[in-house]
């Protein structure tokens, strides 16, 4: 059996190098894709990203990825969004005026100012796992530390989407969402040490279980 083949979407939203290297360390064969043609042939899809909501959505739509990502999620093709790749799944964002992908009902909101609170939320913070049996959390203890860099956070209309939260000042924000074969993290697993790498391995192993022709490399 071959290695899990993951398409990493390149839409000019930040440096994808660390995400690709993390996925390769997790046992996947990674290919950067700049157009949606052939996405269905991959075992799974990864959407990393840093930056602003509106330019990201403009790039995704201009390249034809908007429809392609929605179709991939509908057919239960394994999908992992990271940071901005989580936020664009929502319907809209306070950061801009562009509509999101509308895969996750809800809106992306900015952290509320409060005394002593640093915005952006940057650095290590702990995860409260709300979907304890999610495949992403296999072998991951509650209160694991993860690395964040963001000023906005997704607020799903349905709390059942929430797979983990974190606390920034007095505000509880969504750290991860999951449903079916879709997973997304607001934090950067590829920058979150051994447990972050374990999360990426968990995703690769989940993809392998969904695709009997592939298996993660040792």
UniProtKB/Swiss-Prot annotation:
InterPro entries: Class_I_gatase-like, GATASE, Imidazole-glycPsynth_HisH. The active site is at 83 (nucleophile), 188, 190. It is found in: Cytoplasm. It comes from the Bacteria. Residues 5-213 form the Glutamine amidotransferase type-1 domain. Pathway: Amino-acid biosynthesis; L-histidine biosynthesis; L-histidine from 5-phospho-alpha-D-ribose 1-diphosphate: step 5/9. Its EC number is 4.3.2.10, 3.5.1.2. The keyword Lyase applies. It catalyses: 5-[(5-phospho-1-deoxy-D-ribulos-1-ylimino)methylamino]-1-(5-phospho-beta-D-ribosyl)imidazole-4-carboxamide + L-glutamine = D-erythro-1-(imidazol-4-yl)glycerol 3-phosphate + 5-amino-1-(5-phospho-beta-D-ribosyl)imidazole-4-carboxamide + L-glutamate + H(+); L-glutamine + H2O = L-glutamate + NH4(+). Pfam families: GATase. The keyword Acetylation does not apply. One of its GO terms (molecular function) is imidazoleglycerol-phosphate synthase activity. Keywords: Amino-acid biosynthesis, Cytoplasm, Glutamine amidotransferase, Histidine biosynthesis, Hydrolase, Lyase. GO terms for biological process: L-histidine biosynthetic process. IGPS catalyzes the conversion of PRFAR and glutamine to IGP, AICAR and glutamate. The HisH subunit catalyzes the hydrolysis of glutamine to glutamate and ammonia as part of the synthesis of IGP and AICAR. The resulting ammonia molecule is channeled to the active site of HisF. Heterodimer of HisH and HisF. This is Imidazole glycerol phosphate synthase subunit HisH. It comes from Synechococcus sp. (strain JA-2-3B'a(2-13)). The lineage of its organism: Bacteria, Bacillati, Cyanobacteriota, Cyanophyceae, Synechococcales.
């Amino acid at each position: 059996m071959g290695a899990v083949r993951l398409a990493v979407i390149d839409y000019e939203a930040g440096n994808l190098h660390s995400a690709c290297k993390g996925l390769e360390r997790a046992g996947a064969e990674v290919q950067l894709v700049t157009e949606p043609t052939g996405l269905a042939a991959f075992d799974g899809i990864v959407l990393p990203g840093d930056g602003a909501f509106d330019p990201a959505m403009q790039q995704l739509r201009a390249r034809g990825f908007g429809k392609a990502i929605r179709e991939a999620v509908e057919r239960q093709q394994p999908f992992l969004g990271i940071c901005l790749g989580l936020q664009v799944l929502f319907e809209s964002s306070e950061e801009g005026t562009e509509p999101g992908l509308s895969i996750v009902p809800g809106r992306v909101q900015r952290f509320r100012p409060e005394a002593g609170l640093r915005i952006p939320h940057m650095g290590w913070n702990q995860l409260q796992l709300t979907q304890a049996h999610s495949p992403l959390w296999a072998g991951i203890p509650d209160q694991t530390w993860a690395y964040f860099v963001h000023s906005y956070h997704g607020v799903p209309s349905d709390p059942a989407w929430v797979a983990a939260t974190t606390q920034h000042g007095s505000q509880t924000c969504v750290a991860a969402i999951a449903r079916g074969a879709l997973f997304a993290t607001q934090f950067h697993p590829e920058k979150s040490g051994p447990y972050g790498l374990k999360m990426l391995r968990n995703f690769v192993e989940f993809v392998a279980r969904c695709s009997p022709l592939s298996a993660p490399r040792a």
